[in-house]
């Protein structure tokens, strides 16, 4: 009982002590509060809060100290006090900093508090600087992209075109100009001569036809004035294509348009010329014929001459014709030369036919000379397996893809087309030696086709625009990298277009890849797997041996293949004396080489070839000792 009374008395004493402590604390608070208000009225709120915080904590500290002595402190209370400490310390340090009486320890605390703010501010500045840098980089990237892309942001509407021309362009589906169009059309419309170079599929045709149509419109050309614009193309198909574009552009104009090309009826063409053709598209040979022999052909008023694919026009069999044509045409005229590549011979022609020309090369400085969307590869196939390789490849994609296959000679193209038809491979062919009334429908048919196989020679390698071609297969390699570029240019045409190209080489021809890479043409090797080839060799050999017409066709193809091989200008790559004739014969369906008269150069390997003299016809391309029809690359 005594103990209980003592404990009760002790607890009462504790309560009394607590009350005394609280009262003392309140009195001290009043004393501290009053002078602060008098001396520093500007900091009234801050000091009051700070002092109140300190006062409120004082009894807790004393209570905590007392409880600690008794050994019954509350852990939760300790945690609460510990959490409140930094907050109060922050407020105190901020206040002391304002008064300027912080000590070193407090300075460190303030520095620690200010550090995150400084970091945030720095991060914000860095972000702003980065944004500006990114914006500059984006603009540079856009400029770079525009320089390397086919398209520009310039519209046809920005040109000072007649309403009728602009209406036609709009109906054709064009809004923005390509690089060559944006750079060539303005000087041409101002009457300047232009030497233009742009990759295939870049819109060269519109680049010269739009100024041509505008010229005829401005000078009010009529049929009785004759021909005011003349466009010369190297091939019939390219002439037909250019004629089609010109016809669309002149749809709402009163001026007339026509074409004269080899293979058509000359008499019919002469009658049309006599009626007056204001814009004439022509191939060199037939044009020269009409210039010299058609009396009703009026060309004395010619204002504008265009030579499209000028480097091809200058090849053998065209040089002399072109020289005569230029001598017959009026000297006072505007002239332009356009091509996918600029050779020394084109520059020579420009010097004698152009006056102070504007030189435009939209591909200058590009890392690659072929189209961006083009995937290019090559496959090394032994000569004896070439035919089986081609059959296997075409069988895989027949009816699924649109494919062009290039051969070195007309006879080789003809034989393969006949063979494929015998074995139920549907295919078309474009080459020399086919009547124009058959060749033109074939050309138009392949344009409209979604899938199909076209076998062709280099006659289809320049300027022709076949939509959506998936594969270019160069079964026979080209003469040089320039021809390679033109061939693969039949696919991946236009902005964003995709396509694939495959070059078939024998092991002896592998050095050609070095020349391609030196010409900035990226090619990847594809693995040749013999086990995947169709096992049809006995069938093909039996078919050819039993079919007289097919056998004769194969003989001619074999013969011209070897003659064509001998005419290659790059003798260090394509040396006819390194051919294994037994393997070559196998690739044409023979078990043994056929007996044919081969006229090839017996002089052996020659590492160098002299270039063809400008404006002089060289000796026959495939004849013994004759120079190549192509200038050495």
Curated annotation (Swiss-Prot):
PROSITE patterns: DEAD_ATP_HELICASE, HELICASE_ATP_BIND_1, HELICASE_CTER, Q_MOTIF. Residues 1-147, 608-633 are annotated as: Disordered. The keyword Iron does not apply. Residues 185-360 form the Helicase ATP-binding domain. Residues 88-97 have a biased composition (Basic residues). A motif (DEAD box) lies at residues 308-311. Residues 1-17 have a biased composition (Basic and acidic residues). One of its GO terms (biological process) is stem cell fate specification. GO terms for molecular function: ATP binding; ATP hydrolysis activity; RNA binding; RNA helicase activity. It holds the Pfam family DEAD. A motif (Q motif) lies at residues 154-182. It comes from the Eukaryota. InterPro entries: DDX18/Has1_DEADc, DEAD/DEAH_box_helicase_dom, Helicase_ATP-bd, Helicase_C-like, P-loop_NTPase, RNA-helicase_DEAD-box_CS, RNA_helicase_DEAD_Q_motif, SPB4-like_CTE. It catalyses: ATP + H2O = ADP + phosphate + H(+). ATP binds at residues 198-205. The keyword Ribosomal protein does not apply. GO terms for cellular component: nucleus. Keywords: ATP-binding, Coiled coil, Helicase, Hydrolase, Nucleotide-binding, RNA-binding. PANTHER family: RNA HELICASE (PTHR24031). This is DEAD-box ATP-dependent RNA helicase 27.
């Amino acid at each position: 009982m005594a103990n209980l009374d003592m404990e009760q008395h002790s607890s009462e004493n504790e309560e009394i002590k607590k009350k005394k402590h609280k009262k003392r604390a309140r009195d001290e608070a009043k004393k501290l509060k009053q002078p602060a208000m008098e001396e520093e009225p500007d900091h009234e709120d801050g000091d009051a809060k700070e002092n109140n915080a300190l006062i409120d904590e004082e009894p807790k500290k004393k209570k905590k100290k007392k409880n600690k002595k008794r050994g019954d402190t509350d852990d939760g209370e300790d945690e609460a006090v510990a959490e409140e400490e930094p907050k109060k310390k922050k407020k105190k340090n901020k206040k002391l900093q304002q008064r300027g009486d912080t000590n070193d320890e407090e300075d460190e605390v303030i520095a620690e508090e200010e550090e995150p703010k400084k970091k945030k501010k720095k991060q914000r500045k860095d972000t702003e600087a980065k944004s500006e840098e990114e914006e500059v980089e984006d603009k540079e990237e856009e400029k770079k992209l525009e320089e390397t892309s086919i398209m520009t942001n310039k519209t046809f509407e920005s040109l000072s075109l007649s309403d009728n021309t602009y209406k036609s362009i709009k109906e054709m589906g064009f809004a923005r100009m390509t690089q060559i169009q944006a750079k060539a059309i303005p000087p041409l419309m101002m009457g300047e001569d232009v030497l233009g170079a742009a990759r295939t599929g870049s819109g060269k045709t519109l680049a010269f036809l739009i100024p041509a149509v505008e010229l005829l419109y401005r000078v009010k050309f009529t049929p009785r004035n004759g021909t005011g614009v003349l466009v010369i193309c190297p091939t019939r198909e390219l002439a037909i294509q250019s004629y089609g574009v010109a016809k669309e552009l002149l749809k709402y104009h009163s001026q007339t348009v026509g074409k004269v090309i080899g293979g058509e009826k000359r008499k019919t063409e002469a009658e049309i010329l006599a009626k007056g053709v204001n814009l004439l598209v022509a191939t060199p040979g037939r044009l020269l014929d009409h210039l010299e022999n058609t009396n009703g052909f009026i060309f004395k008023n010619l204002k504008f001459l265009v030579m499209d694919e000028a480097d091809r026009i200058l090849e053998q069999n065209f040089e002399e014709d072109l020289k005569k044509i230029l001598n017959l045409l009026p000297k006072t005229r505007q002239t332009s030369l356009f091509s996918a590549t600029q050779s020394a011979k084109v520059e020579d022609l420009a010097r004698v036919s152009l006056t102070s020309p504007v030189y435009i090369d939209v591909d200058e400085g590009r890392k690659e000379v072929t189209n961006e969307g083009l995937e290019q590869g090559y496959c090394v196939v032994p000569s004896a397996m070439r035919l089986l390789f081609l059959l296997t490849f075409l069988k895989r994609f027949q009816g699924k893809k649109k494919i062009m296959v290039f051969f070195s000679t007309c006879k080789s193209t003809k034989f393969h087309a006949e063979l494929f038809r015998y074995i139920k491979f549907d295919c078309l062919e474009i080459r020399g030696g086919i009547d124009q009334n058959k060749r033109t429908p074939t050309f138009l048919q392949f344009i409209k086709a979604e899938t199909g196989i076209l076998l062709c020679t280099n006659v289809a390698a320049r300027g022709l625009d076949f939509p959506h071609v998936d594969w270019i297969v160069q079964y026979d390699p080209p003469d040089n990298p320039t021809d390679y570029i033109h061939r693969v240019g039949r696919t991946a045409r236009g902005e964003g277009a995709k396509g694939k190209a495959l070059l078939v080489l024998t092991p002896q021809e592998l050095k050609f890849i070095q020349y391609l890479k030196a010409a900035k043409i990226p090619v990847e090797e594809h693995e040749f797997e013999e086990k995947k080839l169709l096992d049809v060799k006995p069938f093909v050999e039996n078919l050819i041996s039993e079919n007289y017409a097919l056998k004769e066709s194969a003989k001619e193809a074999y013969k011209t293949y070897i003659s064509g091989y001998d005419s290659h200008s790059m003798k260090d790559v394509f040396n006819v004396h390194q051919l294994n004739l037994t393997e070559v014969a196998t690739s044409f369906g023979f078990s043994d080489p056929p007996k044919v008269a081969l006229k090839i150069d017996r002089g052996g390997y020659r590492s160098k070839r002299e270039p063809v003299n400008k404006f002089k016809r060289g000796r026959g391309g495939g004849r013994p000792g004759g120079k190549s029809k192509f200038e050495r690359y």
